[in-house]
């Protein structure tokens, strides 16, 4: 079939398998061009491995460090009549390209929050790799099914205490609007921590440790975003921030556990990027369009792949083997360039000046839209979008 982008809300409901593969190839090419990561781990598990920072982590490990990788994710396959999710095609492309280079790559597809996911992953590690040296936790989900009760818990992207009103961009109509978000209830705050906090990361690491599949010196990292006062009301000071603070709590507990065998657990605070997750957060698209333009002008712009390569090569697995620099909460800070005073001051001053008329001129809004479509495999150089493609891509993913 010939597949064109169809946007509904902040989601593109169609995906292009060839475009998704081209995206993965682009990230692999970047990683190879940077050269090998000297002290990289050789057996890596990525939970949430099919898009965004998780996918880039798997690429950095495999193509930057020559690692055998296992990926866990929850994606839908395509059929002859309907495309699957972008993450499905990303993961399929990754496996194919890794194996072509003689790298071990296997994936498990299903609910990563479930006990079955953890058990099947443990069985696979025991069977094929023995142990793992690194566990990346990069799940972004609006819903978590509690393994013990089967109850579905939903997260809320809301402020705390009072209604948050701000200038935002309507990405469907490309106009500047005033967005208001009602505050979260106590229950919604708790639920957001349950879905997006550190509990499941702890459950994963504890299950892997008890099964004896964590190698000595195993490092684990989970991803977070703090941002700046421009986005704090909806993010860090909102329900989502409470969940991210719970990640810090989990990191501390896990670090105590892993440091006994020479390992570590850290939260890595990353920069804002265009992902399906960030496009759903009110105000983020406008902030991203502003900050990207300034960072590009300053020569410090990074996408997911650049950030993660820097995290591997300049933080966790440095060439001289020295310990990673961390902040006062033991976090790896990769948002250091975005948070530079000159960049943030530029955004603060620009924010009130943005109108529908000057949006495209004063910000990288056009590029934001292009990057958003790229997530789903569209608008990529060298891909023939008039060609007939088969959305039914064969894989040997292990079903959870």
Curated annotation (Swiss-Prot):
Show the Pfam families listed in the entry.
Eno-Rase_FAD_bd (PF07055), Eno-Rase_NADH_b (PF12242), Enoyl_reductase (PF12241)
Keyword annotations for this protein, in alphabetical order, are: Fatty acid biosynthesis, Fatty acid metabolism, Lipid biosynthesis, Lipid metabolism, NAD, Oxidoreductase
**DNA-binding among keywords:** no
Q: Which GO terms describe its biological process?
A: fatty acid biosynthetic process
Which GO MF terms are attached to this record? enoyl-[acyl-carrier-protein] reductase (NADH) activity; NAD binding; trans-2-enoyl-CoA reductase (NADH) activity
Residue positions annotated to bind NAD(+) are: 48-53, 74-75, 111-112, 139-140, 244, 273-275
The entry describes its oligomerization and partners as: Monomer.
Q: Family assignment?
A: Belongs to the TER reductase family.
Q: What does this protein do?
A: Involved in the final reduction of the elongation cycle of fatty acid synthesis (FAS II). Catalyzes the reduction of a carbon-carbon double bond in an enoyl moiety that is covalently linked to an acyl carrier protein (ACP).
Q: What is this protein called?
A: Enoyl-[acyl-carrier-protein] reductase [NADH] 1
Primary gene name: fabV1
């Amino acid at each position: 079939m010939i597949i064109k982008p169809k946007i509904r809300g902040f989601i593109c409901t169609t995906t292009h398998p060839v475009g998704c593969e081209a995206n993965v190839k682009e990230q692999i090419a970047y990683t190879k061009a940077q050269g090998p990561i000297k002290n990289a781990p050789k057996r890596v598990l990525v939970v949430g491995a099919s898009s965004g920072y998780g996918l880039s982590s798997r690429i950095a490990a495999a193509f930057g460090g020559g690692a055998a990788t296992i990926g866990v994710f929850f994606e839908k396959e395509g059929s002859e009549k309907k495309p699957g999710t972008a993450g499905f095609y990303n993961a399929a492309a990754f496996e194919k390209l890794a194996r072509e280079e003689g790298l071990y790559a296997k994936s498990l597809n299903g609910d990563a929050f479930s006990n079955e996911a953890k058990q099947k992953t443990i069985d696979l590690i025991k069977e094929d790799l023995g142990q793992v040296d690194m566990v990346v936790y990069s799940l972004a989900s609006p819903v978590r099914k509690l393994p013990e009760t089967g109850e579905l818990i939903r997260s809320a992207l809301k402020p705390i205490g009072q209604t948050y009103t701000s200038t935002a961009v309507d990405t469907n109509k490309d106009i500047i609007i005033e967005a208001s978000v009602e505050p979260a209830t106590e229950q919604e705050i708790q639920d957001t921590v349950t879905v997006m906090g550190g509990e499941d990361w702890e459950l994963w690491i504890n299950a892997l440790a008890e099964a004896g599949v964590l190698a000595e010196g195993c490092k684990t990292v989970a991803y977070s975003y703090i941002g700046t006062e421009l986005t704090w009301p909806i993010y860090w000071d909102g329900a989502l921030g409470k969940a991210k603070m719970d990640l810090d709590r989990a990191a501390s507990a896990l670090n105590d556990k892993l440091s006994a065998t020479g390992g570590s657990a850290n939260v890595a605070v990353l920069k804002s990027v265009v992902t399906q997750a960030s496009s759903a957060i009110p105000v983020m698209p406008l902030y991203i369009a502003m900050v990207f333009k300034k960072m590009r002008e300053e020569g410090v712009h990074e996408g997911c792949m650049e950030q993660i390569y820097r995290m591997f090569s300049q933080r966790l697995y440095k060439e001289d083997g020295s310990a990673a620099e961390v902040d006062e909460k033991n976090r790896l800070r990769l948002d250091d360039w975005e948070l530079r005073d000159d960049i943030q001051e530029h955004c603060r001053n620009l924010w009130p000046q943005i109108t529908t008329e000057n949006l495209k001129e004063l910000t990288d809004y056009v590029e934001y839209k292009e990057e958003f479509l790229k997530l789903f495999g569209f608008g990529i150089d060298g891909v023939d979008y008039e060609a007939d493609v088969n959305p039914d891509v064969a894989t040997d993913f292990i079903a959870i």
